[in-house]
Amino acid sequence: MPPKPSGKGQKKAGKAKGAPRTDKKRRRKRKESYGIYIYKVMKQVHPDTGISSRAMSIMNSFVNDIFERIAAEASRLAHYNKKSTITSREVQTAVRLLLPGELAKHAVSEGTKAVTKYTTSK
């Protein structure tokens, strides 16, 4: 014998079937961030160190700023050479132009390593 439905589960009269619900909670829009990647790199370099949300926000702004600068410079270089595609060569040159001395060398070597790893994994 099937169980009897309680008063709570019964449908209420007066509401049209299939009508859109207005009392649903709105989903918050996702905010993209480099936070998890910054955290992973920090743990590789300093495993016993933490980071505050304010410091993470500053680091995220820094990464966004550098990304925009490199992208703009690489775009400019492609335009100067009458190319419609930004390749790793333009990005590498942009990094050399934007970052000072030793920092540029390290960035280029890490970038080359990342591109090589990506192409071999395909």
From Swiss-Prot:
<comment type="function">
    <text>Core component of nucleosome. Nucleosomes wrap and compact DNA into chromatin, limiting DNA accessibility to the cellular machineries which require DNA as a template. Histones thereby play a central role in transcription regulation, DNA repair, DNA replication and chromosomal stability. DNA accessibility is regulated via a complex set of post-translational modifications of histones, also called histone code, and nucleosome remodeling.</text>
</comment>
<dbReference type="InterPro" id="IPR007125">
    <property type="entry name" value="Histone_H2A/H2B/H3"/>
</dbReference>
<keyword id="KW-0539">Nucleus</keyword>
<keyword id="KW-0238">DNA-binding</keyword>
<dbReference type="Pfam" id="PF00125">
    <property type="entry name" value="Histone"/>
</dbReference>
<dbReference type="GO" id="GO:0046982">
    <property type="term" value="F:protein heterodimerization activity"/>
</dbReference>
<feature type="region of interest" description="Disordered">
    <location>
        <begin position="1"/>
        <end position="31"/>
    </location>
</feature>
<keyword id="KW-1017">Isopeptide bond</keyword>
<dbReference type="InterPro" id="IPR055333">
    <property type="entry name" value="HISTONE_H2B_site"/>
</dbReference>
<comment type="subunit">
    <text>The nucleosome is a histone octamer containing two molecules each of H2A, H2B, H3 and H4 assembled in one H3-H4 heterotetramer and two H2A-H2B heterodimers. The octamer wraps approximately 147 bp of DNA.</text>
</comment>
<comment type="similarity">
    <text>Belongs to the histone H2B family.</text>
</comment>
<dbReference type="GO" id="GO:0030527">
    <property type="term" value="F:structural constituent of chromatin"/>
</dbReference>
<dbReference type="InterPro" id="IPR000558">
    <property type="entry name" value="Histone_H2B"/>
</dbReference>
<feature type="glycosylation site" description="O-linked (GlcNAc) serine">
    <location>
        <position position="109"/>
    </location>
</feature>
<keyword id="KW-0544">Nucleosome core</keyword>
<dbReference type="GO" id="GO:0044877">
    <property type="term" value="F:protein-containing complex binding"/>
</dbReference>
<dbReference type="GO" id="GO:0003677">
    <property type="term" value="F:DNA binding"/>
</dbReference>
<keyword id="KW-0325">Glycoprotein</keyword>
<dbReference type="GO" id="GO:0000786">
    <property type="term" value="C:nucleosome"/>
</dbReference>
<protein>
    <recommendedName>
        <fullName>Histone H2B, gonadal</fullName>
    </recommendedName>
</protein>
<keyword id="KW-0158">Chromosome</keyword>
<dbReference type="InterPro" id="IPR009072">
    <property type="entry name" value="Histone-fold"/>
</dbReference>
<keyword id="KW-0488">Methylation</keyword>
<keyword id="KW-0832">Ubl conjugation</keyword>
<dbReference type="GO" id="GO:0005634">
    <property type="term" value="C:nucleus"/>
</dbReference>
<feature type="modified residue" description="N,N-dimethylproline">
    <location>
        <position position="2"/>
    </location>
</feature>
<feature type="cross-link" description="Glycyl lysine isopeptide (Lys-Gly) (interchain with G-Cter in ubiquitin)">
    <location>
        <position position="117"/>
    </location>
</feature>
